Every structure is written in C-alpha cells, then in structure tokens.
Amino acid sequence: GMTVNSFASVSLNPALVLWSIEKKQPSFNNFLNSNGYAVNVLTKNQNNLCSLFSSPIEDKFKNLKWDLSESGHPIIHDTLAWFDCVKWNYYDGGDHQILVGEVKSHSHVEKEPLLYWNSKIS
C-alpha cells in the first residue's frame, strides 16, 4: 500500500477511476503486475495512516484492522470511503504510470475527510 495525493473519476459508465504511481516507487512493480487495487479514502482522524502508507515500512497492514474485498484487495476499517477496482488499463505518463481501474464495489460514510492542501495535511 501507499499514500497518493491525487485520485480522480474518469467515467461513470463504466465506473472508472485513476491514480498515478512514480516508476521509482518500491511498490511500483507490485501495482503494475496486480489485477487491480483498492482505494481507501482517509478521515480527518487518520493522519497516522497517511504517514504510515507514505513510509518505507514493508508490512503496512500488520497492525491495522482490514478485510479483503471480493476482488482480493485490502479494505481498511473505519475509512471515509473505499473503492474496489480491477485493472482496466495502465498508461505511461512520463516518470509515472497512470493506473485506471473499473470500480466493482464501493462504500462511504459521513465523516470529515483528510485533506492535503497548501502543502499541509489536515
């Protein structure tokens, strides 16, 4: 897992989303060779998870409460929202790879989001 600073909707029908990963990231090949991914949107009170997933720690899920989605991707408990995605297509984007996934399932709750704005996380 990793922390990303941008995530976007691509299409409503089919439901497609995207994010990008720098090709130098240690987990780059894991994501590139996977059948998809989960996006877990953090709440305002989950700044610690943002820091954890941006760290070099290998087993980031070790002390977390999480379940596998129907597609086999990790869904972290108590997040604002999650999207379970299967690989639609991946595109070259210079020093990044753009990962487009088809949303197979999702969920959300009414909580305040964790935001990154003006070079600050809050």
Where are the regions a protein language model picked out?
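Basic, polyanion-binding surface patches
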Residues: G1-S122
